[in-house]
Amino acid sequence: MEKWWLNSMLSNEDLGRRCGLSASLGPIGNTSGSEEPIINDSEKNVNSWSGRGSYSCSNVDYLFNLGGVKDVWSLISGETFWVRDSNGDSYSIYFDIENKIFEIDTDSYFLGELESLFSSYLNLNNGSKSYNRYYDHYVYDTRHSWKSHINSCIDSYIRSETNMDSCIPNGSNNSSDNYIYSYICSDSERGSDRGSSNLKTSGVSDSDFGRHNDLDRNKRYRHLWVQCENCYGLNYKKFFSSKMNICEQCGYHLKMSSSDRIELLIDPGTWDPMDENMVSMDPIEFHSEEDPYRDRINSYQIETGLAEAVQTGIGKLNGIPIAIGVMDFKFMGGSMGSVVGEKITRLIEYATDRSLPVIMVCASGGARMQEGSLSLMQMAKISSALYNYQSNKKLFYVSILTSPTTGGVTASFGMLGDIIIAEPNAYIAFAGKRVIEQTLKKTVPEGSQVAEYLFNKGLFDPIVPRNLLKGVPSELFQFHGFFPRP
């Protein structure tokens, strides 16, 4: 069941216009006792949802939600409200934002039940008559305790670079419209919290808008927001890339696409990709009736815009020419098949011939099972090319481990860097936690496969935050004799 806090919105005329409430709440007028002007349109008739004609209702004093009354769940729907005007007349209002339905009923029995229940609720909670001038009508006004806070949150939320003014006044029922209603109208807690919920007060915090109990609702607005997998905070997607996919709430490093990493590390205008059109041809004819390998490859190509799980090429890092390979976890979990292995091997051989430093950014679940032993052979092939590059040619290879780096990538080129860099909180392992526990029948300690723990065990060199990830390799390259070129 959904509950909506509308009083705060009705007491802000400018916000009401931007959220499109003027059209749907036309019959509701203003009262002289209101602290702020309520949305006030011309008086008009509204069709009754019970089919008994129409009602003209203006000058309504107050609109509130009965979400805090435990026994009302069986009487009212998710968007039903009780209104009492200055004449003492009562109405029940059905309000459906998504379908733009606004209906009014004056069923006396229904309202009598609500009055009785609400009266009991106030007596149970020791409501004070001196606190609220609407007490005689069994209306518990929470305005003074939370209105200022909610209004502040709403105004800053809408005005903060979301450009809502350009898309809402035309009355379109687009997804950003629904988003603002769902989040700004503060769809309150549901599910197991129903039995213990009370009317919201000034204790509401900004972080409540990103609680984990809103996960289902957030799926509808993925094109607008990115939810942190660590703190469940919301990050505005439009600016998320410019913040290097770092959560604004807790600083957690979320996954980045290979294209975003190339943009982060490589100087603008210097990127020259290699072997872009190399794709897998299903070498062992892996067959699955539910999800054929070729169909799966095609779907990931469409979804990511990539041909395979790694991008390789030449570019400049702070003016220093380098060869770089960047794995993309969004493409089949960054799994390493024959094409991934071949592209990385060719990159290393190219860098060997031209004496270029190499960076490999790892993000992989390991070898690709759909290619069988051919995928395992890539571990040896890449390691052999690196041996010639490092031991024979004495060139410099930097491995950057991001979350997650596991399986065959960890067991091969991921751990062969002259300098091994890890990102904060990166998940780095050979076998995953579930595999270890199911195989060895032992419990894996929590956090034992995280970068900070492994750093203390000496598994790699520095842990470098993402905002410094371009500067640190640049200094390392110069220390090893690689300098910027014009």
Swiss-Prot record:
Zinc finger feature spans (C4-type): 228-250
Pfam families: Carboxyl_trans
Domain CoA carboxyltransferase N-terminal: 224-486
Reactions performed catalytically: N(6)-carboxybiotinyl-L-lysyl-[protein] + acetyl-CoA = N(6)-biotinyl-L-lysyl-[protein] + malonyl-CoA
Cofactor note text: Binds 1 zinc ion per subunit.
Location relative to the cell: Plastid, Chloroplast stroma
Binding residue positions for Zn(2+): C228, C231, C247, C250
Family the UniProt entry places it in: Belongs to the AccD/PCCB family.
Name of the protein in its database record: Acetyl-coenzyme A carboxylase carboxyl transferase subunit beta, chloroplastic
Source organism (scientific name): Nymphaea alba
Gene this chain is encoded by: accD
